[in-house]
């Protein structure tokens, strides 16, 4: 007889229709559900850590490069438009224990102007987004996160 272990997974507990908040889908790499503020620079991360110490910060990039390691390390989550399970973003985020979604194909980041577009919808730096590092989904706004047990029979 085999005993299957259950594990706790962070999932979203939507108070409204999730389809109304849906921004896009990518490849879930690591972590579970996370809601936080969208950020683009190390300076923004440091400012939010002072202004709102308890908030999660989600770094957005079209793609990451090795020079982004400080930002990735300082942020709580990572969202990229490109990449796969073996991409720089995915490997580093997984190794650092960060919630991460890569290859969100309808995401376009303008790092210089500090905003992202999901199709026609613009999300600016400091606004809330929600990512699911297990499912790969991305949602607009701050969403309640709960712990769910998975894998038990």
Go through the PLM ranges and name each one.
Residues 1-153:
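Non-catalytic, soluble scaffold/interaction modules
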């Amino acid at each position: 007889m085999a005993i299957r272990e259950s594990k706790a997974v962070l999932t979203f507990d939507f108070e409204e229709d999730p389809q109304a908040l849906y921004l896009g889908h990518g490849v879930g790499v690591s972590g579970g559900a996370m809601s936080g503020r969208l950020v683009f620079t190390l300076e923004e991360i440091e400012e939010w850590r002072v202004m709102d110490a308890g908030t999660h910060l989600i770094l957005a990039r079209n793609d990451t490069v090795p020079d982004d390691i400080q930002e990735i390390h300082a942020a709580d989550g990572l969202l990229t438009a490109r990449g796969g399970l073996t991409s720089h973003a995915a490997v580093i985020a997984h190794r650092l224990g960060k919630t991460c979604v890569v290859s969100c194909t309808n995401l376009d980041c303008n790092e210089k102007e500090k905003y992202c577009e999901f199709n026609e919808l613009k999300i600016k730096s400091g606004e809330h987004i929600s990512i699911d590092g297990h499912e790969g989904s991305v949602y607009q706004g701050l969403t309640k996160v709960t712990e769910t047990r998975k894998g038990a029979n």
